[in-house]
A protein has these predicted regions:
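Short, flexible surface segments
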Residues: 41-42, 139
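Exported/periplasmic cell-wall-interacting domains
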Residues: 34-36, 55-166
Length: 166
């Protein structure tokens, strides 16, 4: 999994081949791993826990426990963690505090903000996208959060033999 901060994109990649691509939102405070910085950490992390199996879209998760509340997309005044949580743990000195800081990939009801930095350190996704991603990744999956562009990692699509020539 690759998270490009400048592109505000999360790409699920297997051996250089793009499996899925999602628009995201990283921290509005930039990147870093200092305690209480509200920044998105950089480097290699891994999925350490997954929370929210079978919850409906918009289900609120507080302190990693479903509350039973459902929040509508773009509900005014609501900045809840919803739908699913993928909890990250850092693998490097530069991101070793990520788990203690509760850095997640999670759903947000503030879907209008997806595509631009708006979070408090986590990686936010649309509910339908986090549900899809959650079902595709496993505990132990590596996550690279980078200042590089997605096209640096993903091979261009090869033309199909079935492509039409005009």
């Amino acid at each position: 999994m690759i998270v490009s901060v400048p592109d505000q994109v999360l790409a699920l990649v297997d051996r250089g081949k793009l499996i899925a691509r999602y628009s995201i939102s990283t921290s509005k405070f930039g990147t870093g791993d200092s305690a209480a910085s509200y920044r998105t950490p950089l480097g290699t992390l891994f999925v350490s826990a997954k929370i929210g199996d079978r919850l409906p879209p918009g289900a609120v998760i507080k302190n990693r426990i479903p509350t039973g509340e459902i929040v509508a997309v773009d509900a005014p005044g609501r900045d809840a963690i919803v739908s699913r949580v993928i909890w990250l743990r850092g693998m490097e000195t530069q991101n070793q505090k990520a788990r203690d800081r509760c850095i997640y990939i999670h759903g947000t009801p503030e879907e209008r903000r997806i595509g631009k930095p708006a979070s408090f350190g986590c990686i936010r996704m649309r509910s339908r996208d986090i549900i899809d991603l959650y079902d595709r990744v496993h505990i132990g999956t590596h996550v690279l959060i980078t200042l590089r562009r997605i096209h640096d990692f993903v091979k261009p699509e090869e033309p199909s033999l079935l492509a039409r020539s005009d």
